[in-house]
Amino acid sequence: SRFIKYGAQPKSSLWFSEQRQILRFDFIIKFIKRNSPPGQFLINDIGCGYGGFLKRLEDNFNIDSFSYAGFDLAKSPIAYCNRGYARKGAQFYFSGIPLETADYNVMSGTFNYAPDIKFKAWKGYLFKSLYSIWNLTRRSMIFNLMISEEERITSQSICYIRKETVVNFCQRNFGTTYEYFSSKLPREITFCVCKT
């Protein structure tokens, strides 16, 4: 597995550049800072990998100000996170879907890699997953996707979708949808969908 080969670093989760990963996390954190309720908030990190987002949260928030639950379908990273990062207020689970409702449901890179699947099936999976997660969201659902005018899955199994496809789906089915873009991540957009 990639985790066994590379250990707890971005390479093991297909994010080859730590700087780019931090940029992704910082978009999410900036949005949470602007919109977080007074008092403690709860975050579900779906597709948490080796726990990088939790570390970034702890760099930006007092650990008493939030509770964190990380979810992943890969056993090795979850075992690693449970050994190294689990504490009161930060738990990790071998599961693809959160166990309870959270203020923020975060998916950083969760939907970008899809081996052995056609685009139409992946898109159906993406939208079905967003529906499920929206029902477990109190304030906002935040996720990033690879964007292109040509919707496709590459030979490296990376999924690209049109920005308008995502925005239209989210506005029609969920709520106000904000987009965050950086020239340093030219093919990605972070979407923040808010409950009113």
Where are these regions (language model features)?
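Short alpha-helix
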Residues: 158-174
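A short SAM/SAH-binding and catalytic strip from SAM-dependent methyltransferases
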Residues: 104-123
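Conserved class I S-adenosyl-L-methionine
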Residues: 39-49
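Core SAM-dependent methyltransferase catalytic element
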Residues: 180-196
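Class I SAM-dependent methyltransferase SAM/SAH-binding core
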Residues: 44, 52-92
